[in-house]
Amino acid sequence: MNGKYYYGTGRRKSSVARVFLTKGTGQIIVNGRPVDEFFARETSRMVVRQPLVLTENAESLDIKVNVVGGGETGQSGAIRHGITRALIDFDAALKPALSQAGFVTRDAREVERKKPGLRKARRAKQFSKR
């Protein structure tokens, strides 16, 4: 990665994304693969591009991402959060628009732990009256 780059760390569920942003042609590389190849679902690809589309930087910036942990939804959310933080590092004037869209806030929802005596976090064993 030559020249000036902007960095942002994004987190969502159990995923962590490290995002490097440089001036370029608009390509997004996730773990060495293009975003369209990395994510099977169209919604995941859309989530990743949301901050770029909102700030009208989709064609002017290249993005390189390293993402670990979690599944497709968590990883795409982590990448979106990381891209948002990198964009703020790139241009602080973008923060109000990104904040208004809700991209700056880290989604704090995590998986609830399984409790003893229950089948899942809240699901109890089936009760039989007779």
From Swiss-Prot:
Pfam families: Ribosomal_S9. One of its GO terms (molecular function) is RNA binding. SUPFAM superfamilies: Ribosomal protein S5 domain 2-like. One of its GO terms (biological process) is translation. Disulfide bonds: none annotated. One of its GO terms (cellular component) is cytosolic small ribosomal subunit. Keywords: Ribonucleoprotein, Ribosomal protein. Belongs to the universal ribosomal protein uS9 family. This is Small ribosomal subunit protein uS9. It comes from Neisseria gonorrhoeae (strain ATCC 700825 / FA 1090). The lineage of its organism: Bacteria, Pseudomonadati, Pseudomonadota, Betaproteobacteria, Neisseriales.
